[in-house]
Amino acid sequence: CNNPYARVRTPAIDQLARNGIRFTDAHSAGALSGPSRYGLVTGRYFFRTPKKSEYWGYLSPYIEPERLTIGSLMRNAGYTTACVGKWHLGLDWQLKDDSKPQILTPKKFGYTNTDFSAPVKRGPTELGFDYSFILPASLDMPPYAFVRNDRVVDPDVILTADAYPKKQDETVYAWDRKHTNENDIYWERGVWWRNGEMSRSFKFEEC
């Protein structure tokens, strides 16, 4: 029902559209994915939060613990809720040594003081979602690890540079030639991400 000329059949999506509400006019709450996601999850404009930047993998939580979310709203209405995919709204990571900061080097791209074996707090399951399977940030910044509910799936952490050597000779540069930072990891043709912590079993490869 969404596209009569489509070559691929989508009966499940079509049924959802017929039995629910189709949103055909959408507007973004921000120019980046994080602010847009914050607006979708909370129903609030991102500029109403005290945070204005700090967009990287280990950012602190954006959503206040008492904030109503689409997850808690739907759960209160009797639905079972889940959050799957990119989160990048901040998590409360536990530290190995509370006397030290989380980031141990000024470049942010080496090992950190993060305890990946400890429960991860202030995530989706504390914000109205019964189940979650998320990537904490985005695919171009550490930590590269999956989090199921409040636990890192594979807490055995290494650096991306240990798994994928730095290779610039086969790299296809972007239009602005931004893929030249010394902390970047290059692998095969055009694949690029920042050096940092990753689960040993995490695979950053095309299937």
Model-derived regions: residue spans:
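Formylglycine-dependent sulfatase
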Residues: C1-C207
